[in-house]
Curated annotation (Swiss-Prot):
InterPro entries noted in UniProt: Nucleoid_associated_NdpA (IPR007358)
MF term (GO), any: double-stranded DNA binding
Major localisation: cytoplasm
This protein's UniProt keywords: Cytoplasm
Protein name: Nucleoid-associated protein PSPTO_1265
Highest taxon above the source species: Bacteria
UniProt organism field: Pseudomonas syringae pv. tomato (strain ATCC BAA-871 / DC3000)
Amino acid sequence: MPIRHCIVHLIEKKPDGTPAVLHARDSELAESQAIENMLADLNESYNAKQGKAWGLFHPESGAHPFSGWLKEYLDGGKDFTAFSRVSVEHLQKLMEESNLSVGGHVLFAHYQQGMTDYLAIALLHHSDGVAVNAELDVTPSRHLDLGQLHLAARINISEWQNNKQSKQYISFIKGKNGKKVSEYFRDFIGCQEGVDGPGETRTLLKAFSDFVESEDLPEESAREKTKTLIDYASSQSKMGEPMGLEALSELIDENQPRAFYDHIRNKDYGLSPEIPADKRTLNQFRRFTGRAEGLSISFEAHLLGDKIEYDETAGTLIIKGLPTQLTDQLKRR
């Protein structure tokens, strides 16, 4: 993963309305294995993060100047350090306007993954721990807690520059503590939601369930195709990449590679050609499970409404086509 430019600044800020203090670095970080490891760990943590949103820049304006500074940097009008400096100064001002915000180390990293250029921006915090030194003494230790990302965004620079119709070249963490906590960071980037990741994922799963039903697939085949969909979606999510409908269709049925894709288009589900996979929605699709005293139930979601009927009023499940192994045990009781 080639790292083109990387820099870290520090903003000291407490959530009590006191002014934010900026400690800006005046040069880029030199290339090192530590930087590569940090960025790799950051990407892994970011990709695994649930609750992300996808969108695009607001039109450049006084309220949303970041995209203009980024374009100026990419066009050669600003070097990376100057771009990051003017950006972090803007972030500092927005932090001061938000009483709920806290400071931290602000990372800017322009890197390449495959043929795609990305800009990652994250507000990082430290965790206190312990370490054993060369003299085998236990000593206090501080490290960047990359596993606890709350404010971060990633811009697909290549998508932004080459696909003017795209509405999902920015991904960002929405924040689980409520909109106000992360609103200032979204304003800093100047982005608006363009794609409803959970909604698009739910629609895709509905289209898949309809497809399985329309094809009248045997249970084993339906299970295999479900696993293929979940595995592909999970793999794309882990890499931070969207699901491509055509690629997914080819994986689901190698003999009829366009069958699922044509089903989606013919039924007009309104899905985008590429969908950001929402992990929480995918996890809910995998299986329904429940336990009670002496009872354990687990079944794949696509069976609901087909081999499994749920009566919410009566609080009952009706299971059709019991497994042979289970019926044999019941007969021998």
